Amino acid sequence: MSTKRDYYEVLGISKGAEAQEIKKAYRKLAMKYHPDRNPGDKEAEEKFKEINEAYEVLSDDTKRKTYDQFGHDGLNGQGGFGGQGGFGGQGFGGFEDMFGDIFGDMFGGSFGGGRARRRGPQRGADIRQSVTISFEEAAFGKKMSIKVNRSEECEECNGTGAKPGTSKKTCSTCNGTGQVRTVQRTPFGNIASSRPCSACNGTGEVIESPCSKCHGTGNTRKVKTIEVDIPAGIDDGQMIKLSGQGEVGEKGAPRGDLYIVVNVKSHPLFTRDGNDIYFEMPITFVQATLGDEIEVPTLDGKVKYSVPEGTQTGTVFRLKEKGIPRIRGNSRGDQYVKVVVEIPKKLNDKQKELLREFAKECGSNVHEKKKTFGQKIEDMFKKK
């Protein structure tokens, strides 16, 4: 019987684990026990070997099936650890594929060899800019011009960065590859890694005589006026994307994009919820009691609305298609009008008397408020 630990136990996974789960567990443990992170720790080194052995078997469907049926003994002669290639008979290439992104961080560049390539022209960066518009402009749209400070191709050197009459040279440090290779000793032998060449910034070319206008960058800053079409129905905080209006790209690479963030001012009368708007309409208690035809403000101007008699405060009525236009489609939201019945704070004697008569007609006894001493004195002087 084999004395090796169960491979599933080594990786801390169940026997029914999917391939992605196996890979995730392996990467986590390998990062933890890697010898470069545990220098001089023999136990960590052995653990690391055990983890790789387990993964080498469980990541291979054929070997995993054999292992599940016959255990460790069933793998004898199949090129497991100690077989050809050093690591599971796959050579170092498979190990590199698995750990390229991990060891790339450890060694400061690409892991392995033969994959380094010079950096290609980079797309321009995106620009983010804000505009502020009114509530009505958000509702019905607006065409506007904005000024954007962005990079433009240098007119002096046509974007090359080199002084007119000169050209870029092949980088002597990396011989035009854009990458510098290094070899480091590890417990597993020499490992080649590559990193972007610092002399040419990974481009493979250097400028010996920089352009005096752009100082070798190939671009200059300019303020550009751009026309923006604000669509009807846009809401506060939404963005408009203008493709190809961002920073200039390198060596003819595409420009970045311009993102316009729209800020919408609040309205003194209306509030917005989606494509609907809300408005509170004050009316007198007489209008509420007897009913009346009133004029209601809308985004399109005032419209007439008949308030039915007996309308209570808090009553909400709807004006169809008087809200915000929908960005996609030809329809609009609605306007909801909430009635607020205003009660007068001061009434003259005649108005009070009329209300008392009204109360009597309704069978409601309204007790007259007792006058204060000061009010009685005031009434005495009025009689004189």
Swiss-Prot record:
Binds 2 Zn(2+) ions per monomer. This is Chaperone protein DnaJ. Its cofactor is Zn(2+). Residues 6-71 form the J domain. The J domain is necessary and sufficient to stimulate DnaK ATPase activity. Zinc center 1 plays an important role in the autonomous, DnaK-independent chaperone activity of DnaJ. Zinc center 2 is essential for interaction with DnaK and for DnaJ activity. It is found in: Cytoplasm. Keywords: Chaperone, Cytoplasm, DNA replication, Metal-binding, Repeat, Stress response, Zinc, Zinc-finger. The gene is dnaJ. A zinc finger (CR-type) spans 141-223. Participates actively in the response to hyperosmotic and heat shock by preventing the aggregation of stress-denatured proteins and by disaggregating proteins, also in an autonomous, DnaK-independent fashion. Unfolded proteins bind initially to DnaJ; upon interaction with the DnaJ-bound protein, DnaK hydrolyzes its bound ATP, resulting in the formation of a stable complex. GrpE releases ADP from DnaK; ATP binding to DnaK triggers the release of the substrate protein, thus completing the reaction cycle.
